[in-house]
C-alpha cells in the first residue's frame, strides 16, 4: 500500500503574488489587521492598499486574519467578526449585507488526500447577498453560499448552499427555510 510522502510535496506551481508583497503583507497583517485595536478604518485602509476590492460600509473587528488581500472582494455593508480567518489562497467574494461571525473560517485551500505527495488544492468562495456565516463555522473551497443562506454555529459547508436556506452540522445539511420579516 502506498504511503504519504511529504518530502515530495511541491507547490511551486502556486504563485499567489510577488514575494516582496507577500512578506510586506505578513508584517502589516500582524501589526494592523490581526491586532486587538478597535479601529476598523485602519484595517480597511491597509487591505485596500494591498489590493483588496472594498466598496461600501465594511466593519472588520479585531483579530481578523486575511491571507492575501489582493484576492479579496467585499461589497458592503458587511460585518466581519472577531478572529475570523479568511485563508484566501484563491478568490473570496463577499456581497452586500453579509455577516461573518466570530471565529469563522473561509478556507480556499486543501490537500489531495489521494496523492502520495499531498498536493495543494485551491478554489474560490462566494458569499452572495445577505449570507450569515455563524460563529466558529467553516466554509470550504469551491463553496457558493447563495442569497440569504445561513450556516449555523460550528457547521462546515462545502459545495452549494441554496438561497434562503438554513444549514447546520458537519457536513452542513439543510435544516429549514429562512424567513425574513419586516421591522
Where are the predicted features?
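Conserved sequence/active-site signature of Rossmann-fold short-chain dehydrogenase/reductase
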Residues: 106, 156-157
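Glycine-rich phosphate-binding "P-loop"
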Residues: 59
